[in-house]
């Protein structure tokens, strides 16, 4: 099977949307019956994003096999119907770590280890390893051309054209074409300079995707084509749109997929984008609008909750409801500032770490429980829902998590036992930690649902498989008293009897789960828990009115 590689780089500025562009292009090529995978190369020194602050990097997307990866992999999965693995994302730190381990073992037979060839060879090997079962491999290189961190990756993809043949490689450069409102003009000079910098590395782009506030007119695209040495048909205008799900059609309308298929000499059927037409239609046509509050601590960067926000939108599509998402800093609720919660039709508390803002989250859950507002807790959102119920309903004021209070008298939430590097009782003391990265309960795990429960009804099956990312779990030894008071466990892991889902029966909709259902939601299908949560929030609005 001939393998063709499409390398996507970015220029001028960061955050232009290379991930969305790669995912959208992948979706079009997938619709042409091509076998697609997408790889994200991140130039930072961290081994993976698992220990990076969400405020700096955005969410950590967890794959089925338990890899902690860049949030762009979430876009890849949602757009191309393909599950990502640990092979689909690697970093400079990960590559150097691998090479240094080999050096320590003596695998290089005494050679002097250098960026070229050892680091670049390791990068190429990882790319090729991930491409085994695909005939089109899209590779997104993080960062911006000109960054010192990106140089080994750019050199590696330059070499790949030599190794596998230039006819099997396309270089796409995504660049900013700014619109100067005061002059009423689009400026192409930044793109020209960015391409010049790419040429200095030895890479001639084959296609330019030009991000701009407005459509780049033909005469400007001709100018870009002339100065950047690409055909005018290969200069694609990507204007700002109000929905990422419009991007596949926008690229298709400019025949980007035709250009690529002709370049690779692929005889494949035309792309059928009917499913994307349906998504766009659902996004525009709704019967109701509701307000969902996400109570979190990382709200300064909305990307910290990217998959959760997308899953809420997907659920809205399925219910013909427009979901207005409000990001609320949990610390703003700590002084019992319930006014900011009063207009909400549903409250969601997502995953997180640390004790900052916990009081505000506890108060938000209490407000949702007492005022019959639909509540959905995810990961940490389940753990603190249990703490709130134990403190305020059961009357166990000492109930807490050892994450927030290592010496608490009633540790209803405690460290997962017998996990690598975290079985020590003094694990919460920084000096006793060995590794934080990669030491949680990660990836897909089976869960058994209780008969006659809401979750069983929604999933319509007894055994489900969902993705996890947590270091703390419910302490089963202390939970019986809480369960007797009415907080039901309706899902447990098959292997270790871990509490996975809780429900409150005397409430319109109160459900929380230890796993992360947002990672498997798609714009076409949604996710059963999110869909019913939004449905219940819609009912709450009608009742409230």
From Swiss-Prot:
Residues the record lists as binding CTP: 14, 147-149, 187-192, 223
EC number: 6.3.4.2
Residues that, per the record, bind ATP: 15-20, 72, 239-241
Residue ranges of every copy of the Glutamine amidotransferase type-1 domain listed in the record: 291-543
Class of this enzyme: ligase
List of catalytic residues: 379, 516, 518
UniProt record, GO biological process: 'de novo' CTP biosynthetic process; pyrimidine nucleobase biosynthetic process
This protein's GO CC annotations: cytosol
Residues holding Mg(2+): 72, 140
Functional pathway: Pyrimidine metabolism; CTP biosynthesis via de novo pathway; CTP from UDP: step 2/2
Signal peptide: none
Regulation: Allosterically activated by GTP, when glutamine is the substrate; GTP has no effect on the reaction when ammonia is the substrate. The allosteric effector GTP functions by stabilizing the protein conformation that binds the tetrahedral intermediate(s) formed during glutamine hydrolysis. Inhibited by the product CTP, via allosteric rather than competitive inhibition.
UniProt catalytic activity: UTP + L-glutamine + ATP + H2O = CTP + L-glutamate + ADP + phosphate + 2 H(+); L-glutamine + H2O = L-glutamate + NH4(+); UTP + NH4(+) + ATP = CTP + ADP + phosphate + 2 H(+)
GO molecular function per UniProt: ATP binding; CTP synthase activity; glutaminase activity; identical protein binding; metal ion binding
Keyword Thylakoid listed: no
Positions with a binding annotation for UTP: 14, 187-192, 223
Segments traversing the membrane: none
Binding site for L-glutamine: 352, 380-383, 403, 471
InterPro entries registered for this protein in UniProt: Class_I_gatase-like, CTP_synthase, CTP_synthase_N, GATASE, GATase1_CTP_Synthase, P-loop_NTPase
Other remarks on this protein: CTPSs have evolved a hybrid strategy for distinguishing between UTP and CTP. The overlapping regions of the product feedback inhibitory and substrate sites recognize a common feature in both compounds, the triphosphate moiety. To differentiate isosteric substrate and product pyrimidine rings, an additional pocket far from the expected kinase/ligase catalytic site, specifically recognizes the cytosine and ribose portions of the product inhibitor.
Similarity comment text for this entry: Belongs to the CTP synthase family.
Name of the protein this chain belongs to: CTP synthase
Organism of provenance: Buchnera aphidicola subsp. Acyrthosiphon pisum (strain APS) (Acyrthosiphon pisum symbiotic bacterium)
Gene from which the chain derives: pyrG
């Amino acid at each position: 099977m001939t393998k063709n590689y499409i390398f996507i780089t970015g220029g001028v500025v960061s955050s232009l949307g290379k991930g969305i562009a790669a995912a959208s292009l992948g979706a079009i090529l997938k619709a042409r019956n091509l076998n697609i995978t997408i790889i994200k190369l991140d130039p930072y020194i961290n081994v993976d994003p698992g220990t990076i602050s969400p405020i700096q990097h955005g969410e950590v997307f967890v794959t089925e096999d338990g890899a902690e990866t860049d949030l762009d992999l979430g876009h890849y999965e949602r757009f191309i119907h393909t599950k990502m693995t640990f092979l689909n994302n690697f970093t400079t730190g990960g590559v150097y770590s691998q090479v240094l381990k080999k050096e320590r073992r003596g695998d290089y037979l005494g050679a002097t280890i250098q960026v070229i060839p050892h680091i670049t060879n390791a990068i190429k090997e990882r790319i090729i390893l991930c491409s085994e079962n695909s005939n089109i491999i899209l590779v997104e290189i993080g960062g911006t051309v000109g960054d010192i961190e990106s140089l080994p990756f750019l050199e590696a993809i330059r070499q790949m054209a030599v190794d596998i043949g230039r006819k099997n490689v396309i270089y796409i450069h995504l660049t900013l074409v700014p619109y100067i409102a005061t002059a009423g003009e689009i400026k192409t000079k930044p793109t020209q300079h960015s391409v010049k910098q790419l040429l200095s590395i030895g890479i001639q782009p084959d296609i330019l995707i030009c991000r701009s506030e407005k459509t780049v007119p033909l005469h400007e695209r001709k100018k870009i084509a002339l100065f950047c040495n690409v055909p005018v048909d290969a200069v694609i205008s990507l204007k700002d749109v109000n929905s990422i799900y419009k991007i596949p059609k926008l690229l298709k309308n400019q025949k980007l997929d035709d250009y690529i298929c002709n370049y690779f000499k692929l005889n494949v059927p035309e792309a059928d984008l009917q499913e994307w037409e349906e998504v766009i239609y659902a996004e525009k046509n709704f019967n109701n609008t509701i307000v969902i509050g996400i109570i979190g601590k990382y709200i300064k960067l909305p990307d910290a909750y990217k998959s959760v926000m997308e899953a809420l939108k997907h659920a809205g599509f399925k219910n013909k409801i427009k979901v207005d998402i409000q990001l609320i800093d949990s610390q703003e609720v700590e002084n019992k500032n319930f006014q900011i919660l009063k207009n909400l039709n549903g409250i969601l508390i997502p995953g997180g770490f640390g004790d900052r803002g916990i009081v505000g989250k506890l108060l938000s859950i209490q407000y949702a429980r007492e005022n019959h507002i639909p509540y959905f807790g995810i990961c940490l959102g389940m753990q603190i829902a249990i703490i709130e119920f134990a403190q305020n309903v059961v009357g166990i004021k000492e109930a807490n998590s050892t994450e927030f209070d290592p010496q608490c008298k009633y540790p209803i939430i405690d460290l997962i036992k017998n996990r690598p590097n975290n079985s020590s009782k003094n694990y919460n003391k920084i000096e006793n930690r060995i590794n934080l990265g990669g030491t949680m309960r990660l990836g897909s795990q089976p869960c058994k649902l209780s008969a006659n429960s809401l979750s069983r009804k929604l999933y319509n099956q007894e055994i489900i498989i969902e993705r996890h990312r947590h270091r703390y779990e419910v302490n089963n030894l202390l939970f019986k008293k809480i369960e007797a008071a009415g907080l039901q466990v309706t899902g447990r892991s098959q292997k270790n009897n871990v509490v996975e889902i809780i429900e409150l029966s005397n409430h319109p909709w109160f459900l929380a789960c230890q796993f992360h259902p947002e990672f498997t939601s798609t714009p076409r299908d949604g996710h059963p828990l999110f869909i019913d949560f939004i449905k219940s929030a819609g009912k709450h609005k009608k009742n409230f009115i």
